[in-house]
Amino acid sequence: MKILFDFLALYQKNGAAEYARRVFYALLERVEHLPNAENITITCLFDSHHLPAYTEMLPDNLCHKYVDFVDIQNGISEINAQNYDVFFFGCAQNAGWNPQLAELTCKSILVFHDCVWEEFYNNDINLYLAHNANDMFHYRATGPRGKKIYWDIKSPTIRFCRWLLHVRQHGILEEGYNMLQSALALFHKREDNIIVTVSNYSKNSIMYNFDVKEDKICVKYSPERIYSNKMYGMKRATDEKLLRLINSQVKYYLMVSANRQVKNIKKALCAFKVFAKYRLDVFVVTVGYGMELFDKHVDLPFLTDSDLYLAYKSCYALLYPSLFEGFGYPPLEAMRFGKPILSSNVCSMPEILADAPIYFSPLYESAIFNALMSLDDSNYSYYSKKSAKQYEEIRKKQEDDLSELVDMILNEYS
């Protein structure tokens, strides 16, 4: 059996890359224990212009008797000539950057993580971000003695130009809106092709936006990310700022992926600034926001996996004001340690997190403030236990779904 496996998803470290990485290692482990495994080859489809971000998964580093590599730069005709039995496309959105994948002739299992651009377009989230995202109408300059000074741009012309640039970057002028069209063309190429997605919400979103038949979409929850044994034993952060924060033992609410505007960090920070006036012993910690907006706001740089693990483990609670999620890894990362979750109530969040979090509308600062005020030491244990319980339930489903997904990939093997 010849399996073509998507390594294009690994060009940067994100949720889709973690997904593909986890499925790859689960598949490889299964193959190693199959009878007549010497008849199976896993060929990793990579792009020599955008190599995997994971060092151990680079073509020169991943040496295994069942694994080889093929470069997409060689052309689809050469790839089709190898007569692969199945192509596992770990992030179908990447077909937008590689439209030639629509010409593959083998059976394909396509993973649609979400319909983010379609959701943005249909619900005017682009416009919301353009007006509310991370200080997009604020310029930064260096003043006397290196002090950073911020000011509003008053000129309507400049404000309009900034808005126009922003909405173009967010797809309202069609950039990004057609990211899934090439993947859909590949999907429709063969009757036995199938779409896999990561939540029932995403399944229904695909059906709504693309008129795909329900029985052609299979829901398999995103598998738990890979944790190294080194991370389990890690007790000291390598980032000095995080280390000082942990050693101080202050209560902090954690917000991750703060550089991504869809995570809605600015609005949550506005709510937390008011909250900190009523709860004097708490801080909010963002990862990758790029600035600190008030005294109780601590911004960390992008963290290594082990440091992020410790940041989750040491936080008081996770604050997750995201405007869109197809699945939602970060809350589960925190729930692993029994941390209470304050989460937006949109998209897949209620499905994945069930009744464990304190929910709020991400559109209202007062709603976020209300959620913050709803958690205190008197009910902390209650929400902590609910997080731990829900994490275990989802983890079991993740394990079962991952095993079933590997079965799907190996379906042609006998």
Q: Where does each model-flagged region fall?
A:
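Carbohydrate transferase catalytic cores enriched for Leloir-type hexosyltransferases
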Residues: 1-414
